[in-house]
Amino acid sequence: MATASGAGRVSEPPSTAFAATGLRPLAIGPADRPADPARGEHALLVAGIGDMVITDDPAAGLVAYGLGSCVALAAWDPATMTAGLAHFMLPSGTSGGGPVKFVDRGLPAFLAAFEARGGSIRRACFKVAGGAAMLAIHASSLGIGRRNAEAVTAAMAARGLTFVATDLGGTVGRTVQLDASDGRLHIRSVGRASVI
């Protein structure tokens, strides 16, 4: 069963929003019933800003739309087919927001939820994307994207965890989709598509 953690919701983007990403489309079931794999339909779980989604359904896709300075951390355990995606907004903080709004508090929560769902962080393949400098002012003074990328990298290293692939920095936003069947992270930005 594919579920989103945190609020316990499963969300599907409007079909036009998904089509605009250019990612490999997944067939989504109508809103009035669950996706039916027999019909070629699969769950699409959306990690909004400050949110995470975790599933043990290998037919699911996990997506984070419009990463600018935000960073998405993908985790996939090939033994249990557990997949997770966290959408971090800031390196640290204490104000409200979703369960993974801040890297410093959100990364431990994400890793704990991933393991609670059946994944092993020692066996998992981790990938990270985002952390762009969207505006010249951000690149020169605030550096939120760079700081987000550094915070995730440092927090993972402090736990002895490494990335098998990264797509960080730059000056354009990204949309990412984690394929729960094989751990591939599809990345789409203006004028570019890649898989890591």
Residue ranges of model-derived segments:
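Active-site microenvironment for binding and transforming phosphate-containing groups
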Residues: M1-I196
